[in-house]
């Protein structure tokens, strides 16, 4: 009976400690990144680099990948890039993340991904949108270039028109994704990359504000 009671106490204590640890992580206002990577990268360095600040010893974090896993902790809420040592970067996709408070799970591979916090879930959606856009554009670009080389103006113009339409769609969706977020690092990033209007230099040298998408 005493043994059963003792085991019960240990179990309750363990649950309490796990609960306290989770609660602390949720309230420490830091971004906890847990990552997995291809086992071929074991023993290689992986870096967490700020996107909009100089990469220095103070701003860049690095760890060694062990057993296909790695971890980072950041207390600066900003857009960062996770990338492996450039000697081993071939075939491995860099990954944009937002180092906002919370627990973030990332996968670094030929197609990298992230999930776990609101901005990073939205960033993953934008990444997938971007990848679909790039993929669907490829055949139109190839056909357009071949048509230009062959002197087929009509087909070249048709492909250009299709690409313009796809690009306009992509820009509009990216802008409104950023706008829907109201605030935060990803909101700022998307609206900077995909504004409603931008200043364009005209043939006569004047500067006009024109739509970035329709």
Task: Name each model feature, range by range.
Residues 16-19:
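C-terminal motif of bacterial Sec signal peptides marking the signal peptidase cleavage site
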Residues 175-181:
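Flexible helix-coil transition and linker loops at the boundaries of alpha-helical arrays
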Residues 204-214:
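Alpha-helical repeat scaffolds
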Residues 21-175:
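A non-transmembrane, solvent-exposed segment enriched in polar/low-complexity residues
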Residues 1-5:
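Positively charged n-region of N-terminal signal peptides that target proteins for export
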Residues 182-197:
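Amphipathic alpha-helical repeat scaffolds of TPR domains
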Residues 197-204:
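Alpha-helical linker/edge segments of TPR/alpha-solenoid repeat scaffolds
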């Amino acid at each position: 009976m005493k043994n059963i009671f003792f085991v019960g106490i240990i179990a309750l204590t363990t649950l309490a400690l796990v609960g306290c640890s989770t609660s602390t992580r949720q309230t420490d206002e830091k971004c906890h990144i847990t990552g997995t990577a291809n086992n071929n990268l074991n023993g290689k360095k992986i870096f967490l680099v700020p996107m909009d600040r100089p990469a220095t010893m103070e701003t860049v974090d690095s760890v060694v990948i062990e057993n296909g896993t790695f971890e980072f902790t950041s207390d600066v809420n900003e857009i960062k890039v996770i990338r492996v040592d450039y000697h081993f970067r071939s075939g491995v996709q860099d990954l944009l993340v937002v180092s906002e408070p919370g627990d973030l799970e990332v996968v670094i591979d030929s197609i990298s991904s992230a999930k776990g916090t609101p901005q990073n879930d939205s960033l993953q959606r934008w990444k997938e949108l971007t990848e679909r856009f790039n993929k669907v554009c490829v055949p139109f670009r190839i056909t357009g270039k071949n048509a230009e080389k062959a002197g087929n103006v009509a087909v070249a113009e048709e492909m250009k028109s299709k690409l313009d339409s796809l690009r306009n769609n992509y820009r509009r969706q990216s802008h409104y994704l950023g706008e829907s977020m109201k605030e935060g690092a990803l909101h700022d990033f998307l609206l900077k990359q995909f504004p409603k209007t931008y200043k364009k230099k005209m043939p006569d040298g004047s500067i006009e504000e024109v739509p970035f998408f329709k």
